[in-house]
Amino acid sequence: MCYYRYVQVHSIWRRFCALGLLVPFLLLLFSCTNTVGYGVLQWSLPDLGLSTGDILPVYVRSNVSQVYIVEIQKKKVELPFWQLKLCRTKKEALQYAERLREYRYSYATSVLDGLPLREGPENTAPQVYRLREGQAVKLLWKGTGKAVYRGENRLEGDWFKVMTEDGTTGWCFSHGLSLFDERESRPTVRETDDLARDRDLQHVLNSAWYPEYYRTMVEQRRIDLEKMASGWGLFVGEKKGLARIELPDAHYAFPYSRLVKTGSNGYLFDGSSLSIYVRDAHTLAAQFTDEAGRLRIERFVTLEKTPEEIIAEEQLRRSALLEHVCTPGLRLHSEIYGTLSFTERNVFTWTGARALSPALIPAGAGSTGRVALRCFIDQSLKSEYEGVLSFDFDSAQEWVHFLYLRTPGGLKLEHIDSTHLKDATVLRRSVSPVVLYFAPEGHAEPQP
């Protein structure tokens, strides 16, 4: 009975996660219980009337989304981990807020390109980050550090613990910073009259910007065709005054009146919550507030080839490999698992597979369908298998996946549960795998 109840609860939990209902469920759960702690704001949110040092009750910590869910003006709002310091008790939160009090409204911009942030308050400490000229940082507190010299001359300034707009922290010597109070002034802003001569902006306007994970897929040579399309990315829309961010699971539109440059690498879409920060020639970060009041940061990149070209090459690669593995006319047989044959257009027929249903192949799935190469295997599995064959049975609603290895005597398949897949990659084998051996029809079945 206890095991049955565990299975029921585990099944319900997995369904909440799969349906994207985990955060709403946690909100409902924690709305009736105590908070998980108190968050001290480390970077002001002027749009919400909040400043550094403000304390907010934290209801949920989501390690998956890397956000805290807090209450602001009687609304639940998501804030990224870096923007809050989570404390277990109100007393701890008050102590941390007191530490931030002296420089609560103090920010700074770098007057040098490449100004380093260091692990400690001394010029010989390891570097953790380099600031671009004009990049803004938050001053957290002043520290006692070693003097800094240029030749024999001691430079004026202090060591500050600072934070960048993406949460990176380090120690920075103030000689290379221009400090300002957020209540009185902002970093120098250049109006749009100068933007026509701005090389960074012209590069932004003349380039196509795609989700950062596109580049990761290209570098790893793991192109997930379901997560790549030319219509996803950042679209500045300069002529229409309408910027758009299109993602697989979300759409955002930002009507704006003009582009305003902030510092050396930041641009504000005036009239909207959208700002972009150019990291390098191929990367930028977009920061905005979504319809739920959550601060979001999305990164976008340029590519050497268009998504259409990348998709076409991947489709060609898969087609050639699949034809080599599942050659039309090939018939494979197993005494236990039936006969598997392939014909043109990646069509398969699998008869006599009753031993696999319903545990692996859904009941009523039928015996025909299409086979495809849709997934990849983790590097740790490449010594044992070549790849993944995915079977789409005509009367089933879910794909059935098998690791495969071509052998001199036929084909070896190993069933993979969909829970072992992440980002279209098989991460691990099952604890007790079901392994199938097939031989060409008329030949002896290969042995394990």
UniProtKB/Swiss-Prot annotation:
InterPro entries reported for this sequence: SH3-like_bac-type (IPR003646)
Pfam family, one: SH3_3
Keyword field contains Nucleotide-binding: no
Cell compartment(s), UniProt: Membrane
Topology in membrane: Single-pass membrane protein
GO CC terms, sorted: membrane
TM segment ranges: 19-41
Keyword Ligase: no
Main location: membrane
Cystine pairings recorded for this chain: none
This protein's UniProt keywords: Membrane, Transmembrane, Transmembrane helix
Domain annotation SH3b: ranges: 105-181
Top-level lineage group: Bacteria
UniProt name for this protein: Uncharacterized protein TP_0260
